Curated annotation (Swiss-Prot):
Record's protein name: Proline-serine-threonine phosphatase-interacting protein 2
Function: Binds to F-actin. May be involved in regulation of the actin cytoskeleton.
Main subcellular location: cytoplasm
GO biological process: cytoskeleton organization
PANTHER family, alphabetized: PROLINE-SERINE-THREONINE PHOSPHATASE INTERACTING PROTEIN 1, PROLINE-SERINE-THREONINE PHOSPHATASE-INTERACTING PROTEIN 2
Species, as recorded: Mus musculus
Disulfide bonds: none
One annotated GO molecular function: actin binding
Domain of life, source organism: Eukaryota
Keywords: Coiled coil, Cytoplasm, Membrane, Phosphoprotein
Segments forming a coiled coil: 66-163
Length: 334
C-alpha cells in the first residue's frame, strides 16, 4: 500500500529539515536495539539452561534416590535416573543451540549496520551539500537584493539632482548609476546561477532521500521478518525441548508400569527370609507342679542345676560305728 511506504510519508516542507529522515533513522536504531536485546535474552537464557542442565546432571549422578530399592522398582528408579541424566544433557545442548541463534542475530545486526552505513554516508553528504548550496543561494539573494536597492538609490539620486546639481556632479551620479546597474546584472546572474545549482542539488538530495527510504524500508522488512522467524524458531526449540523431556519421562512411566508390588514383595521374601516356624508359646510353670521340670517343646531334657529335687535320705546302718545320722547328733555345752 502506497501510504505505508517510507518514501511517501517522511518529507517536510522545509528544505533544510531532516525530520523525516531522522524519524526513520531513529526507528531503525530502535529496531537494532530490539534485536540486541533479544540477542542478550538468548545468551542469558542459554546460561540459565546450561546451569540448570549441569545442576540437574550433578543431582542425577551424585544424589542417591532410592538406592536400596529392589527388583522392579529398583529397575524403574534406574530408568528414572538415566532419563533425568538425559534431560540434563538436553538442556545443556539447548544452551549451545541458543548461543548459536544469538550469534546469528548478532551477525544479522552487523550486516544491516554495514548496509545502513553506506546509505547514511551518502545521505549525510547530500544533506551537507544541500545546506551549503542553500546558504550560497541565500547569500547571493541578499547580495542581489542589496545591489537592487543600491541601483534604486542611484536612480533616485539622479532624478533629485536633475535641476540642482552641476554637470560634474550629475556625471558622477550617472557613473554611479551605471555601476550599480552593472552590479545588479552581475548579482542577478550569480543569484540565478546559485538558485539553479540549488535546484539541481535539491533534486539530487530528493532522489537520494527516496533511494534511502527504499533501502531503509527493505531493511526494516528484512529485520522484522528475521526477528519474527528467530522468535518463532526459539519457541519451536523450547517446544521440542518439552517434547523430548516428555518422551524421556514417558520411558520412566513405562518402566513404572512394569513395576509389580507382588513381585517386589515376593523377591524380598525370597532373598531375605529367615524361617517359616515361629517360636512356641511360653507356658506358665507352677513351681510346685511335678510337670514343671518337663522339657518344653524343642528342648532336650536334662538336669536343671537351678531347680534340684530334695536330697535323698540315707538309710540307717546301726552296725557301723563310724556312721551316724542327724538324729544321733547333739550339742555339748561346757
Amino acid at each position: 500500500m502506497t501510504g505505508s511506504l517510507f518514501k511517501g510519508n517522511f518529507w517536510s516542507t522545509d528544505i533544510l529539515s531532516t525530520i523525516g529522515y531522522d524519524s526513520i533513522i531513529q526507528h531503525l536504531n530502535n529496531g537494532r536495539k530490539n534485536c540486541k536485546e533479544f540477542e542478550d535474552f538468548l545468551k542469558e537464557r542459554a546460561s540459565i539452561e546450561e546451569k540448570y542442565g549441569k545442576d540437574l546432571l550433578n543431582l542425577s549422578r551424585k544424589k542417591p534416590c532410592g538406592q536400596s530399592e529392589i527388583n522392579t522398582l529398583k529397575r524403574a528408579l534406574e530408568v528414572f535416573k538415566q532419563q533425568v541424566d538425559n534431560v540434563a544433557q538436553c538442556h545443556i545442548q539447548l544452551a549451545q543451540t541458543l548461543r548459536e541463534e544469538a550469534r546469528k542475530m548478532e551477525e544479522f545486526r552487523e550486516k544491516q549496520k554495514l548496509q545502513r552505513k553506506k546509505t547514511e554516508t551518502i545521505m549525510d553528504a547530500a544533506h551537507k551539500q544541500r545546506n551549503a548550496q542553500f546558504k550560497k543561494a541565500m547569500d547571493a539573494k541578499k547580495n542581489y537584493e542589496q545591489k537592487c536597492r543600491d541601483k534604486d538609490e542611484a536612480e533616485q539620486a539622479v532624478h533629485r539632482s536633475a535641476n540642482v546639481a552641476n554637470q560634474r556632479q550629475q556625471e558622477k551620479l550617472f557613473v554611479k548609476l551605471a555601476t550599480s546597474k552593472t552590479a545588479v546584472e552581475d548579482s542577478d546572474k550569480a543569484y540565478m546561477l546559485h538558485i539553479n545549482m540549488l535546484e539541481k542539488v535539491r533534486e539530487d538530495w530528493q532522489s537520494e532521500h527516496i533511494k534511502a527510504c527504499e533501502v531503509f524500508e527493505a531493511q526494516e522488512c528484512e529485520r522484522i521478518n528475521f526477528f519474527r522467524n528467530a522468535l518463532w524458531l526459539h519457541l519451536n526449540q523450547l517446544s521440542q525441548q518439552c517434547v523430548a523431556n516428555d518422551e524421556m519421562y514417558e520411558q520412566v512411566r513405562k518402566s513404572l508400569e512394569t513395576c509389580s508390588i507382588e513381585k517386589d514383595i515376593q523377591y524380598f521374601v525370597n532373598q531375605r527370609k529367615t524361617g517359616q516356624t515361629p517360636p512356641a508359646p511360653i507356658m506358665y510353670e507352677n513351681f510346685y507342679s511335678p510337670q514343671r521340670n518337663a522339657a518344653p517343646p524343642g528342648k532336650t531334657t536334662g538336669p536343671n542345676p537351678a531347680r534340684r529335687g530334695p536330697l535323698p535320705v540315707p538309710k540307717r546302718i546301726p552296725d557301723d560305728p563310724d556312721y551316724s545320722v542327724v538324729e544321733d547328733y547333739s550339742l555339748l555345752y561346757q
